[in-house]
Amino acid sequence: MKLSTASFFARFVCLIPIILVTKPIYAYDELDLQKLLTTRICNDCNLIQANLDSKNLNDVSLLGANLREANLVSANLRGAELIGVDLTGADLTGVDLTGADLTGADLTGVTLSGADLTGATLWMSVLRNSAVRNATFNYSNLKDTDLTGANLIEVELVSATLNNAELEGAKVWYANFENADLGRANLMGTEIYESNLMGSNLKNAKLIGATFYQSNLNGADLTGTTLDEEASTVQGQSNTRLCNTVMPDGEVTNKDCKR
């Protein structure tokens, strides 16, 4: 039976989507990728899912760039300007971000295993539900950073600044916060397991529901905090400063206000 011209055309049109999806699709802009690699300046570029594995990108400028789901495994981004970048879902395993500026960056759901962010600026950045293992944030600025629900395993945060940081519901295992500044940070419901907070500043931090299982808070400042039963393990640790601190029994202690 012969097909009419109209019927043949209708069937051909139906096949067009099938033909189209077989073509390779690149989420990133190839011209933008080439621009980055040649000029090292690619502000507001589209680099979605770009493969930058092991690339030397130190001191590059990527202000406002879109790097969602990009592969940055073992890349060198020392001193990079990454203000406002979108790194949602990116793989940053082993990346070197020493001294990089990630102010306002979105790192939701990233993988940061083995990454080095020593001295990096992450002010007002978002790391919600991120997987951070064996990473280094020593002397970094994480003020006002959102780490809600993040997994921080074996992370180094020595002398890091986390004022007003959001860590609600985060898992903090075997981490080192020695001399870190956690003033006014939200640690409600945070699971802190075998971690070192020696000499840390926790003034006015929100600690309701936080657990400090086998963690070291010697010399920590708990001024203005409320300790419930979950946080009762901090009592009795040496040199912990308790001033205007609400104890698990509801009593307020000011025993260390003068020191």
Report each predicted region and the residues it spans.
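Bacterial N-terminal signal peptides that target proteins for export
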Residues: 2-12
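Tandem repeat scaffolds
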Residues: 28-259
